[in-house]
Amino acid sequence: DNSYKVSGGLHGVGVSVVNALSSKLELTIHRAGHIHQQEYKHGDPVYPLKIVGDVETTGTIVRFWPSTETFSQTIFNVDILARRLRELSFLNAGVRIVLRDERVALEHVFDYEGGLSEFVKYINQGKTHLNEIFHFTTQAENGIGVEVALQWNDTYQENVRCFTNNIPQKDGGTHLAGFRAALTRGLNSYMENENLLKKEKVAVTGDDAREGLTAIVSVKVPDPKFSSQTKEKLVSSEVKPAVEQAMNKAFSEYLLENPQAAKSIAGKIIDAARARDAARKAREMTRRKSALDIAGLPGKLADCQEKDPALSELYLVEGDSAGGSAKQGRNRKMQAILPLKGKILNVERARFDKMISSQEVGTLITALGCGIGREEYNPDKLRYHKIII
């Protein structure tokens, strides 16, 4: 009776739909020591359920032939099937799933004893990780099962995947909200206790904490509620506190018991906060318009008359005196002059926030017009196609 407590939905709806869209469907059920069988054609039973033999095992075999009257194409994409079956094997540690493609004599076997830990490891392969995988499983008092695995890597993207009763929610929901709240609280608490925020003079957000994070959040809920039939967002209100409490306890303990990992994670988060602040300053700088110059270009820039970047040249010269000489000798139509101080910052070795705070670098960014940072940079906006130093 407990087998279906955490199912994905109404039992039988899936097979009923497949049956309706198939020219033929065969059911073979091993149960109570017998083999039961029934066949359908275009959704209608050919004969009633009958016993055709004896067996000691239990299980169900479903075979179906997609209807060519309904579908113009009935070719199965093995990659899509493999992706979903691999996912199911990760979500159910120890369950062995075999996918055979008899068209090309290919067999995939999915069997992951490590469950979600192996899921995170699979996603993070080829990336440099900052900590060993954190993984816990717990059962809340209200019958909700919570399982989380996570690891930070050296990339800048957040990759958090959420599942309810093995069904993916691409739009997240209450389990994601609970996870994020606990993660941010746990990390902030650790950094405050270690006095890192005051020492580094940064304000950290949830987005900073999740930069480079790979996580799987899987919940088992007795009666889940979703925002739509496609189950893309979980809306069960009781799930958020269950996930938040479980994550709070387990993650706080992890940070205390793994000081080296906690230090590496905190360092990445502080870097992310600095980069975010630097990017904000960069955006403000590139968008800021000069009160005296409508184009918002640097005051020292002697721009050219030509508006076509392909025909325009920018000369970067050292100091105001050289700038004066260059301005006198230039072709105003196509040559722009930008005087810079002799020795500006070595941006290859400088941190992003230090680079942005340099007035000379800022002037250069504004003059070139491309913007800066992952979200703002656009080389198509370059104002000069020839740059002469």
From Swiss-Prot:
Species of the source: Acinetobacter guillouiae
Misc. remarks from the entry: Few gyrases are as efficient as E.coli at forming negative supercoils. Not all organisms have 2 type II topoisomerases; in organisms with a single type II topoisomerase this enzyme also has to decatenate newly replicated chromosomes.
MF annotations from Gene Ontology: ATP binding; DNA binding; DNA topoisomerase type II (double strand cut, ATP-hydrolyzing) activity
Subcellular location field: Cytoplasm
Key word Calcium present: no
Known function: A type II topoisomerase that negatively supercoils closed circular double-stranded (ds) DNA in an ATP-dependent manner to modulate DNA topology and maintain chromosomes in an underwound state. Negative supercoiling favors strand separation, and DNA replication, transcription, recombination and repair, all of which involve strand separation. Also able to catalyze the interconversion of other topological isomers of dsDNA rings, including catenanes and knotted rings. Type II topoisomerases break and join 2 DNA strands simultaneously in an ATP-dependent manner.
Record's GO cellular component terms: cytoplasm
EC number(s) on file: 5.6.2.2
Lineage: Bacteria, Pseudomonadati, Pseudomonadota, Gammaproteobacteria, Moraxellales
Keywords: ATP-binding, Cytoplasm, DNA-binding, Isomerase, Nucleotide-binding, Topoisomerase
Gene name in the database record: gyrB
One Pfam family hit: DNA_gyraseB
Domain Toprim intervals: 312-389
Catalyzed chemical reaction(s): ATP-dependent breakage, passage and rejoining of double-stranded DNA
Marked site (Interaction with DNA) residue numbers: 343, 346
SUPFAM superfamilies: ATPase domain of HSP90 chaperone/DNA topoisomerase II/histidine kinase (SSF55874), Ribosomal protein S5 domain 2-like (SSF54211), Type II DNA topoisomerase (SSF56719)
Broad class of where this protein is predominantly found: cytoplasm
Similarity comment: Belongs to the type II topoisomerase GyrB family.
The protein's name in its UniProt record: DNA gyrase subunit B
An individual GO BP term: DNA topological change
Quaternary organization: Heterotetramer, composed of two GyrA and two GyrB chains. In the heterotetramer, GyrA contains the active site tyrosine that forms a transient covalent intermediate with DNA, while GyrB binds cofactors and catalyzes ATP hydrolysis.
